[in-house]
Amino acid sequence: MARGNQRELARQKNMKKSQEISKGKRKEDSLTTSQRKQRDSEIMQQKQKAANERKSMQTREK
């Protein structure tokens, strides 16, 4: 039974560690939800534009 307890303690320790890491990432960001959405939408638009350019270059080559 000791192993079951050991596994449980290790699981709790890992969960606590991962929560601290995720909290740290959010604090570094320090953006509001709307600012984060705006930033993410700009990034996605840039990616989409680059993908469209690559696609148009491939169709021109054919």
Swiss-Prot record:
User: Which cellular components does GO assign to this protein?
Assistant: cytosol; nucleus
Q: Does the keyword Cytoplasm apply?
A: yes
Q: Name one Pfam family in it.
A: SERF-like_N
Keywords for the protein's UniProt record, in alphabetical order: Cytoplasm, Nucleus
Compartment annotation: Cytoplasm, Cytosol; Nucleus
By its UniProt entry, which InterPro entries does this protein fall under? SERF-like_N, SERF1/2-like
Q: What does this protein do?
A: Positive regulator of amyloid protein aggregation and proteotoxicity. Induces conformational changes in amyloid proteins, such as APP, HTT, and SNCA, driving them into compact formations preceding the formation of aggregates.
What the record says about family reads: Belongs to the SERF family.
**UniProt xrefs under PANTHER family:** SMALL EDRK-RICH FACTOR 1
What does the annotation say about its assembly with partners?
A: Interacts with SNCA; this interaction promotes the aggregation of SNCA.
Name of the protein described by the UniProt record: Small EDRK-rich factor 1
